[in-house]
């Protein structure tokens, strides 16, 4: 669950939110609507933790799937790795494991730590991570031959599809998606609808595509 308690936010003299309290429940799919400038994206950033409220609190689950809006942030990584990075706990374990394996000599402490890391990788389905990531990429029309390329080699529209796959990866407890259908063709939108309609966590979506929202949302919140 995501819980918002007595949250207030203003920019200069403009009050965006005043003592807002609400909750978002697992199994429900929420669409945020409202005119440009109403504060939808700001509210989403408060939910993700990208912004802190000036007053009040937001309580969120540990595993969040958030659609990044920075298409250059992962340019040095392979496409498949950028998706797997959506599960931060798994990615941190994989990186640390690789560092230990690269050592010329391992200590007893390294061996013990490797055992802990293998446990994390197993808990987070790390042994099927590349397969799971590839399925998401295929659903969003990123062909197999692009999965090993660097993100920097992709055009902007395809980068945003990869970042959407990143948000969906790793069984997040909550999905927070700001305009997820941007850069998607009709087949990919249809695939995304099916995916989200089967998702069992908390889903919060901002979209100007009311037809898309009507196809996935159980609740609409107007800001």
Regions from the language model: what does each represent?
Residues 1-223:
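ABC ATP-binding cassette signature C-motif
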